[in-house]
């Protein structure tokens, strides 16, 4: 996985996760999807970032920043900023 790859932590049943993945696809962003229901380390990371909650999507960017349950516009703005 490239150092420039975005990591999306989510679940298969999460509508907001599917929406975020669509936005990433529309922006042709490189990302790695991790289902927290099948990855204990990923679930622990999401809980750590979200103070014990399993809030998804939790999106980790190459610059180290994290967005949790971002709106479509917030995610699009972040992607635009990364592509500068």
Residue ranges and their predicted role:
Residues 15, 41, 74:
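Short alpha-helical
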Residues 46-50, 79-82:
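Short amphipathic alpha-helix with an adjacent loop that forms part of the alpha/beta core around
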Residues 29-43:
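Thiol-based oxidoreductase modules, predominantly thioredoxin-like and allied folds used
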Residues 2, 44-47:
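Short secondary-structure transition/capping segments
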Residues 1-29:
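Local sequence-structure signature of Cys/Sec-based thiol-disulfide redox active-site neighborhoods
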Residues 61-84:
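Non-catalytic, surface beta->alpha helical segment in thiol-disulfide oxidoreductase systems
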Residues 50-60:
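Structural micro-motif
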């Amino acid at each position: 996985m490239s150092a420039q790859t975005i990591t999306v932590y989510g679940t298969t049943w999460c509508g907001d996760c599917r929406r975020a993945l669509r936005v990433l696809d529309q922006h042709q962003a490189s990302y790695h999807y991790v289902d927290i229901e099948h990855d204990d380390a990923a679930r622990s990371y999401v809980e750590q970032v979200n103070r014990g909650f399993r809030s998804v999507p939790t999106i980790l960017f190459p610059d180290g920043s994290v967005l949790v349950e971002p709106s479509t516009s917030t995610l699009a703005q972040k992607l635009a900023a990364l592509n500068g």
